């Protein structure tokens, strides 16, 4: 019977077999595009065979299956359908299929408490079906989930498995497993509001069985468990095999030292692992008492671990830490989300609007309280309580996503790591050949069979360097430490090397390229059909709709008598002089409730048609990046009806206004300000035919408020470039790294900023792409519009920086709507656009993520730098995401910089290049060290001797370990260059270097051997006595002395500095180690002294021969450095001359070459259909 393997695609949410690893914060960040499940169940005969094999082979199969669980599963169990599976094998592949992960999990069963999953009567469908599971979604999607609960209740058993903290339940109707977070997929905002009456105890118990407890559990293993895991690691397994072999070969001191070092290493690893687990557990541990609603108006205090999706929380006014993800359904909250997004500014959360739209935590993040965030203040307006409905719990929450990303980082597909595994495999083959050679030689020398076996196996421990993984890890640890000292924190050290391969970096604009704060330049009022000149001080405006809109159209709140909120809103309100207060305004009806009150300044202008009075905000629709606008509904004492004000992007607000209220020169005036780099916000308003009360205003929908508005004017704000921006951009461009701006701001403003900072040079062409959707029988069309090359920023000519024109016909700029049209209607043109586009404006957060993914499909190594607010998805999807934040770690990116500028980007790239180049050097050195010792042992095996016990100890621990650790300390080069470190280990330069250096090493050792046996005073060793009993002898002394120098020479030769690292002389500890060890080796040759006896060296009395040995060392030193120098300087040119230039394997390079030969678009251009 064949295994039932279900291929589940991650791009189809309705499919319940989908394994989606995204969280509510970042649903698009999953690297998995396909997941395959294979089911297995028990087989008595297979189990008997398995246990028999384990017992007969002394547990070796058990150890092997521990390292390769899939082999054990296939041997013990038989394939079966997923419906009957007891064990699952899960295969996860990324989008490009370059990385593959295998997991083995057990299917668990749990009894379901008999109970109803139906919502209160007002939430039930007409036929009485429950909507609690997923809400009402199109077609019959919710029916499958409802059927799940009915089936499971009938059988009173639930089948599920847990992978990386996420729970997946069996869907009988779909015959697949479904992630529990998808059970609520399709729930509408109306469904969420219907849950505000709470769950019954039976419903809560049943849901807890399905969803699991609301805890983010960090497994903390005991020291005994950790010891078993560490000791049974393949690395330590190889060490144990080697130690046993050395003991059998009478290498007691060496075996004892390696054992002690391994034991200390294990103990340190156990302590560090357990300490990290305990620290992380203490950080994420959250257990608080919360108040929940029950049907019938009852309230109950429960532990936060008991919460399930559908519970309704009563939030205290003093706030606290959120124990789950929840949708706010009544009241408002001021929240600090810095622990997740890195955004230090408190955020105002308002009640989720009712309606048939599907609820999505990302889309409705302004109405969602995320787990782990701190509620600073909660206020109720309609009703006595602030209510929030639980939407996600445990690892499905935002905090759970952060913890999961730390515990289970996304696998990295890196050519260097793949090649290193292949190289180790090649060394293993070489060890096998050496083993065969040694067996033949030792047999000819009539060595006993026991000795032949031990010596042959000993070669394996020589050729395959067991310390290689540790040496490679040291490289990234040094880089991580250097980054930390510069205020850059990294939670995924393996991504440091990826920083060295960056080809393109995307930047957010506001707060990243430009200053975070905005200065109000003035207001452009609208009078009739004419936009008046700029009024520099809005506080001098006459009292009217425009001034009231400026004073009230914001999401500010008061915390401890201090206004908090978006910096732009704070500046706008500050420019009016109005003061924020909370509570009813003076003169309001008794008992009336309002959100906030804006009070006019006491000493305002006297020339007013009516005296200034406080204005109360009745309703707010917060700003949405997707909608690009926010709305408020206000009233004031004496007003007969409230007014609505809208603030947002000029183009969008104008489209919401009645055409007769938008002046004919609106576009020209707007362009005059945006072309100068100013940020422009439009304001509009209208009276509302409702009662001026909070209750009436809260019933309004956003569509009602935003219909048939009247334009009021424009708010012009100045957003200066940060002083570090232009130099950093020029540095990146000079080194061949593309820079791209991805912003939600106006296209013209973004283009101006791009020219001002040097992304687009003064002499470079730029064209704007404008796309139109297909309509009225006309197909979608693209239009390319050339722009002027003047770079004026905020009214002043930008500082000029020399730019290096990029190899492309022209720069392109486009908006988010155009990007959407390109993806949908012009997929073949999209790659051509992406390799030339420099400015992406009016991009929604999800479009930023899509852009990063599209660039990665062109095989760019993509970096993303942003402030972590609207860039969460893009920062996490990028190969190297850098969040500008004061927090040490955030959910949004592997790198977090406390620097408030993009200077961190070149720093990460320099450290990445240094780390990658160092990794190559360390790998080469460890390989050369193994091969050098391999050659020494083979030479000595040939004459029936070997290196001594303490000689191995001196080479492996004193010499090699010291230089391997210290050579990684060299810091990065101070400047970036156009060259990039190699990414492929199996390349001609690397392999050529290894082969030539090994040939030189072998030649020197053989030369020394033949020189010593040619001396008249030479006495050959007694070949009838096996090693190490035939020590000391001349042959061993010469080979050991020469090889000792070779380890130092090779370490220095492969530790070149430029262009990615600082010069060798800057690494003082490394130079001191080389000098000291070299001096000791020189002393061993010239004046052996006290070390001669313990090391088993024979005294050479011929002074001229000693100098001859040092001459060989000097020749080896010069030859090694000459080889590296010639290979670096001449080999690339020779390879280009010998072999014809081939097309690049990277798609973006092929496109650039094509565009260089056939420029596109050709300016001036028209439309493309």
UniProtKB/Swiss-Prot annotation:
Protein name: Polyamine-transporting ATPase 13A2
Domain notes: The N-terminal region is required for targeting to late endosomes/lysosomes. It does not traverse the membrane but contains a membrane-embedded intramembrane domain and interacts with the lipids phosphatidic acid (PA) and phosphatidylinositol 3,5-bisphosphate (PI(3,5)P2). PA and PI(3,5)P2 are required for the protective effect against mitochondrial stress.
Disruption phenotype: No visible phenotype at 4 months. At 10 months, gradual loss of body weight, increased liver size and reduced adipose tissue mass. These phenotypes further progress to 18 months with significantly smaller body size, hepatomegaly, increased intracellular vacuolation in liver tissues, markedly reduced adipose tissue with small adipocytes, accumulation of autophagy receptor Sqstm1/p62 and autophagy-related protein LC3 in liver, and accumulation of ubiquitinated insoluble proteins.
Primary site of residence: membrane
Record text on subunit structure and interactions: Interacts with MYCBP2; the interaction inhibits the ubiquitination of TSC2 by MYCBP2. Interacts with HDAC6; the interaction results in recruitment of HDAC6 to lysosomes to promote CTTN deacetylation.
Entry similarity comment: Belongs to the cation transport ATPase (P-type) (TC 3.A.3) family. Type V subfamily.
EC id: 7.6.2.-
Positions annotated as active site in the UniProt record: 508 (4-aspartylphosphate intermediate)
Ranges facing Lumenal side: 247-250, 444-458, 941-946, 1015-1037, 1091-1106
Intramembrane segment ranges: 45-65
Any GO molecular function: ATP binding
Biological process according to GO: autophagosome-lysosome fusion; autophagy; cellular response to manganese ion; cellular response to oxidative stress; extracellular exosome biogenesis; intracellular calcium ion homeostasis; intracellular iron ion homeostasis; intracellular zinc ion homeostasis
General function of this protein: ATPase which acts as a lysosomal polyamine exporter with high affinity for spermine. Also stimulates cellular uptake of polyamines and protects against polyamine toxicity. Plays a role in intracellular cation homeostasis and the maintenance of neuronal integrity. Contributes to cellular zinc homeostasis. Confers cellular protection against Mn(2+) and Zn(2+) toxicity and mitochondrial stress. Required for proper lysosomal and mitochondrial maintenance. Regulates the autophagy-lysosome pathway through the control of SYT11 expression at both transcriptional and post-translational levels.
Regulation: Accumulates in an inactive autophosphorylated state. The presence of spermine results in a dose-dependent reduction in autophosphorylation.
Cytoplasmic side: 1-44, 66-225, 272-422, 480-919, 968-993, 1059-1069, 1128-1169
Membrane protein topology class: Multi-pass membrane protein
Cellular location(s): Lysosome membrane; Late endosome membrane; Endosome, Multivesicular body membrane; Cytoplasmic vesicle, Autophagosome membrane
Entry-linked InterPro entries: ATPase_P-typ_cyto_dom_N (IPR023299), ATPase_P-typ_P_site (IPR018303), ATPase_P-typ_TM_dom_sf (IPR023298), ATPase_P-typ_transduc_dom_A_sf (IPR008250), HAD-like_sf (IPR036412), HAD_sf (IPR023214), P-type_TPase_V (IPR006544), P5A-ATPase_N (IPR047819)
Binding-site residues for Mg(2+), renumbered to this chain: 867, 871
PROSITE patterns attached to this UniProt entry: ATPASE_E1_E2 (PS00154)
Entry comment on modification after translation: Autophosphorylated. Accumulates in an inactive autophosphorylated state and autophosphorylation is stimulated by phosphatidic acid and phosphatidylinositol 3,5-bisphosphate but not by Mn(2+) or Zn(2+). The presence of spermine results in a dose-dependent reduction in autophosphorylation.
Glycosylation sites: 1022
Keyword list, A-Z: ATP-binding, Cytoplasmic vesicle, Endosome, Glycoprotein, Lysosome, Magnesium, Membrane, Metal-binding, Nucleotide-binding, Phosphoprotein, Translocase, Transmembrane, Transmembrane helix, Transport
Record-linked Pfam families: E1-E2_ATPase, P5-ATPase
Transmembrane segments: 226-246, 251-271, 423-443, 459-479, 920-940, 947-967, 994-1014, 1038-1058, 1070-1090, 1107-1127
